[in-house]
Amino acid sequence: MEAQIENGFACVEGGEWLFGMRQPAAVCGSLAPKRLPRGECGWWRRLFQPDRRRLQCADLDGRMWCGDRTRPFLTRIDLAGRVAVATEKLLLAQPSSRRLGALLRVVPFSYRNAVCTTVLEGGWAVVSTQGRTQRAVVADGETLGVKPEAVVAWTGRPPTGHCPRIRLRDLFLPRPPKSLRLNFHGPCVVWFEGSG
């Protein structure tokens, strides 16, 4: 499958859009070259490849839409932020961004067998590995304990509990640490896969 850059948009073969944003676009996923040509896509700051040519990191300024031939794997980003995207196995890896004045954090611990999409508030979307993503609203003064298996996203304060220091390369582990358990303190909204 080939991609072309046309007027700031990169589209896949057959005319279906792969990327669209208000700045020069670039090829996504395994289509990414190992070395980007000078003068082309100069805004592309860094290229992360923990999964060997499957992950990219882009600095966005504006709106963005992504999809593939069979199903969308990234939908609507309205605000500027740093987003990591890859094939349909991984939708979104965003350590932090601003969403309507609230802080939204998304930590996908695993991207194996990712087959469907869960859309969050404000146009954000993350991958649900097997359609098991749960949404919990935690009121002020309440606490939710989660032992995550794959995807964790939340608004509000950072969680407490046993939370190992996570680096970018660690976000894409085949499986999360066995001892990982997070406590979310309200008011907040939490999306997660696992037991809570």
List each model region and its residues:
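Composition-driven recognition of glycine/serine/threonine/acidic- and proline-rich low-complexity segments
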Residues: 1-196
